[in-house]
Amino acid sequence: RLDYLDLYLIHWPLPKRDNYIEAWQALIEAKKRGLVRSIGVSNFEKAHLDKIIKATGVVPAVNQNEIHPYWPQKDLVAINQKYNILTEAWSPLGRGNQAELSEATINILAEKYNKNNGQIIIKWLLQRGILPVVKSASPQNQRANLNVFDFQLTSDDMKQLDQLGRADGRVDNQDPKTY
């Protein structure tokens, strides 16, 4: 039995249903009652954030979004930073997209730093101020995912990784405006 949750997120804004403000108000109430320590959102874009903040005056602690080298979401990360919202990346390794994971730029950096490609991507996110949520069933990969604090990517490295973004980089085309 739990007395409280550390963090509770609204998973999608679902704009077609247009009830995410009511859902946000319910999370605010749960936080006031001590059932939740922090509240946040997932897959919210600027318009969604603006709408809930304007309606309630409460800024989410976290906005969890799809972010990886093919879909870097620079504008959304900047909006989250403006509101002092922690950006959390889901599918930071592009759901294991082998084309993305084996990009030449990532391969070169992995060799340069004696790291694996996933570690390069995780470090790129961390240096952008983004918290990656990496999942793995393999204890070996779990340990590797944590072994990213003994090196720093240079600003040139970061720029090279930033340039991997694509207009069609989303995984499964899950657009928060229509999903």
List the predicted regions and their residue ranges.
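Phosphate/pyrophosphate-binding loops at sites that engage ATP/ADP/AMP, CoA/4′-phosphopantetheine
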Residues: 1-3
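Acidic/hydrophobic-patterned starts of short beta strands in beta-sheet-rich repeat architectures
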Residues: 7-8
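Beta/alpha (TIM)-barrel catalytic core signal, keyed to glycine-rich beta->alpha loops juxtaposed to Asp/Glu
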Residues: 12-179
